[in-house]
């Protein structure tokens, strides 16, 4: 219990002091004179010039007042001076009115240690559990505070914004892969038709690639290769003619549609105009002696792929701005990137180290569609260099590897590769995994049996044999031999396309940026809580005692407060701040509907 002086002078019993000894709230002052004037303006129930306090033996100090108890019902506070403390003003709560007789009342009290020692205590750096902090940066963006509050925020979100972003707006690409060249080259004396044309396409490879840009309505962009107009055929005409040519259709390995081929192309959506590098592409006319020519684009080489940047705008755009900036953080707000094809990722918007949400698009010309969408500067430290920042963005990527195949009539090899693509990949993964596990587990003993069997036999018993690294190599060779054997079987199968018609016909292209926010009911509930109690910060620092216009809430843990104060009172002050208290800077104490802006 706080120390009480033995006597007091200028004792004033006051009414209408709007806080109590539970120390949930108090009035905070900037000077002792302001403090004195504030209390001195309160209604006075009774005054005494000099008194000796009683009740110390019972640990219930009181002052005897020559008034009937009925006259003191409004008494809530006492202020007095003490000559032994240099006429310091002491402040105290009235805790009880005790009836002595019809003319005398004992007014019990306890010292208000906060008001009494407010200008004697010194707050040192302490562990601050929660307090009111700066909500918004100077540019209007929310300050970052992601410490878990442990509060319920519901299980559902409102979708507040949906945006679709595509690498080249409405333009997409049909990719045709063949085993050999399907076109002649104008101006060349000897035709390269049916020649194997190994080239650089991200890496050295033996296949031939053709691309055909088009729009959903079947039209094609005005396409220039260098300065020459490529005069591309409409996409339907191109498909009709190419499948009418036996030599061409039997040469095709795969066909698919993709949004991005791995190159930042010079494309103007408004003009529907595409410009291509003549060193990388050439016009290709595919024809035979029975069918007319169709014009498309042959890929000569692509030494390196490039990432395309899509600027989606302000990362906070679309969210409803709340009074409390923490409600802009995860999990109260979520940015989702999805393609509506089973690929999605949730982002914590505050960890995008940029004012804008920028998406990096990476693609390639492989044997099937594969496009990666990554968020630039997500979880990227500002100390990272530019190149490393781009690399770091790959850690948060959405990869669309839906086949997007076009239905083809082809030889057994292509149909087998397409129809069993997932199976083959799973076999390869299993073989490599088992090979590694065999090495770790001492599979060296299996080497003899691997050497004694044929490659094809090894492939047929993948699930039943002990796999070592050597076995893995033999099994891979066996599977490749199986594929090579199939290449000799004549055309006989029809390969149907996958979900390409559904995805593209319904407009599911590129990626969608979806902004989600808490349901309004939970936003209101959390907003009122944060308005009253501030945010968890869990930091060692000096507390914010007067940074807001109306009130500051402060809660500490094992706080460090010093000063020329007796130990009992000092310990009580520390306990008050550890329990949490609201420091009011206006007389409207307890009114949380007031605006509480930063000073």
From Swiss-Prot:
Protein name per its UniProtKB record: Tail knob protein gp9
Organism whose genome encodes this protein: Bacillus phage phi29 (Bacteriophage phi-29)
Taxonomy of the source species: Viruses, Duplodnaviria, Heunggongvirae, Uroviricota, Caudoviricetes
InterPro entries: Gp9_C, Gp9_N
Localization per record: Virion
Complexes and interactors: Homohexamer; forms a hexameric tube structure with six flexible hydrophobic loops.
Key words of the record: Late protein, Pore-mediated penetration of viral genome into host cell, Viral genome ejection through host cell envelope, Viral penetration into host cytoplasm, Viral short tail ejection system, Viral tail protein, Viral tail tube protein, Virion, Virus entry into host cell
Function of the protein: Distal (knob) tail protein that plugs the end of the tube before DNA ejection and forms a channel perforating the host membrane during ejection.
This protein's GO CC annotations: virus tail; virus tail, tube
GO biological process entries: symbiont genome ejection through host cell envelope, short tail mechanism; symbiont genome entry into host cell via pore formation in plasma membrane
